[in-house]
Amino acid sequence: IVRNELRRYIVENSKIPVVSYSFNERTSSSTLLTRLEALSTIAKRRELMAREVQVGITMGVDSGSSTTKCVIMKDNEIVGTGWKPTTEVLKSADDVIAEALAESGLKMSDIEAIGTTGYGRFLIGKHLNADLVQEELTVNSKGAVYLANAQKGFATVIDIGGMDNKAISVNDGIPGSFTMGGICAGASGRFLEMTSKRLGVDITELGALSMKSAGGEDVPMNSYCIVFGTQSLVNALAAGYKPEDVAAASCHSVAQQVYEQQLQEVDIKEPVIMVGGSSLIQGLVRAMGRMLNTEVVVPHHSQYIGAVGAA
């Protein structure tokens, strides 16, 4: 409580953003760079981040660890989207751009400005001669509150990604405190991908399967380490638990880890907005809502959140 109050006091009275680390987190050089970039962005680009309306024709490309996304916006409306698994960074980007252009009916020459974000932002930014190359913490928070119609006041953004997770406390569209990372891939969307493969369903079907269960809290599940988590999956199925209960238990385990490791590090305010591809897994959203005792908001186009923020 004291830590949260001190953090809130610093943010509200000094306008200095606060980045948090959980005590058990193993921070990599890439996540440290992202954090430092975010602090710099918040300090230097507050006016840009405070914009509430998109104008003209712009494109955002989000090169994530698992998927690459593209969004084209025209006068505050999404007119084109593209999505595909990340393989070769530049080829994946070119493919999703082609998809978005085809859907929008526009040509590359029609695009007035380009923004890139995600792990491949620098490479793609150079490839496209982008006008904005920005880390995903500030970009995702902006995209989240924009799509959730929560640009005024407080909000909490949760993004459970393929390699790391982000929890961001936002006020008037600008992050105040945030944390990023996790101990192991067992606490990320990667574990849910592994769960779906073990259950013989596509990751896009895992959410519907998990919702057939009451919650799966009674299924022993340890995803603190992805190796032990895999063993838990095998043991649960061998013990006769139904696939839907195992799916729900995996969602509950990931939500619990994010809550224990990261959501203690930010000041949680409603609305709580879940974004990213994992937000389409209904069982995970349900588990997070139960963990926080609130109704979690999943906006339309939530899987394109980084691309929307970049655009």
Model feature map: region roles:
Residues 1-59, 75-77, 82, 87, ...:
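An N-terminal assembly and electron-transfer interface module characteristic of large anaerobic redox
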Residues 13-27, 131-137, 289-308:
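Conserved phosphate-binding/catalytic loops in two-lobed NTP-binding clefts
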Residues 60-95, 99, 176-183:
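Short glycine-rich, Thr/Ser-proximal phosphate-binding strand/loop in the N-terminal lobe
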Residues 86-90, 172-212, 230, 303:
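Glycine-rich phosphate-binding loop plus the immediately following alpha-helix
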Residues 229-260, 303:
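Adenine-nucleotide phosphate-binding core of ATP-dependent small-molecule kinases
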